[in-house]
């Protein structure tokens, strides 16, 4: 596990350098704030309270904190970034007593907590997204092919598509990531872009954010399927549910909701799409029917969550989850 986290952290270096080049020190401080509180939560709860002496060696707190920082706005208040890192670690990993036992993606949870408790910070018109005085390059100076190398808008992790591709190539080279989830997610999303544009649906999610989430967030080791066909199925459904949310008027939270809906289905998907004793991943008719059943359930859940979002009930679900998490912390002492 330690080697995986080290490789993930190395893959983030190109994006870290780009963030510093575009916005100077501010986004670095945002990421650092998230990392510090994530690791502090790891020390307090895992090391001292749960007596898990090996937790710090995994570097999972640092990795969760770093990735959580990368999905925030470049000028997110440092106390909000610190809150996100701590919540991601506590309620995404620690309450389940280990990285390999977690159900929900910690990074996604960290961002959802920000949406819930600090909704104005990541609003589209929030000053956290841009600061003319803190930018080294003006928006008018980046266009065309140059925007693939460098942009100056969006979450910290999406400021350079080229940097993201370098990070992805490194992870694939180090066999810490496969193509299955990102490619199936991207193909579905790009097809969805065509459909939404044909139906005059305004999609505000940026290409850079889609790429970053598909490469560095959706591929989390223990909250996504293990096998090739299962990964493709997962990526496709993540893209499909995201498109559904777009059509139903949900934009900034679309990918977050999609991943959280899918995470609890990881183990059943592993069961359906596991290779046979000879390593063959061929799918039987019964497994296809089971997969279709899961797909229908996930689509229905996407519609259900959209209505909960519309009527403002999602924060209350988060509050209930917080109570559940505190209860687990108490019982896991």
Q: What role is predicted for each listed range?
A:
Residues 7-14, 30-42, 60-65, 69, ...:
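Alpha-helical transmembrane segments in multi-pass membrane proteins
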Residues 1-47, 308-317:
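N-terminal signal-anchor module of multipass membrane proteins
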Residues 172-273:
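Alpha-helical transmembrane segments
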Residues 53-64, 80-84, 101-111, 179-187, ...:
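Cytoplasmic-side transmembrane-helix entry/capping segments in multi-pass membrane proteins
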Residues 101-166:
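Long hydrophobic alpha-helical segments that form multi-pass transmembrane helix bundles
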Residues 40-52, 89-100, 166-176, 215-225, ...:
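C-terminal ends of transmembrane helices
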Residues 24-37, 75-86, 147-161, 198-211:
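Structural signature of hydrophobic alpha-helical transmembrane segments
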Residues 281-333:
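Transmembrane alpha-helices
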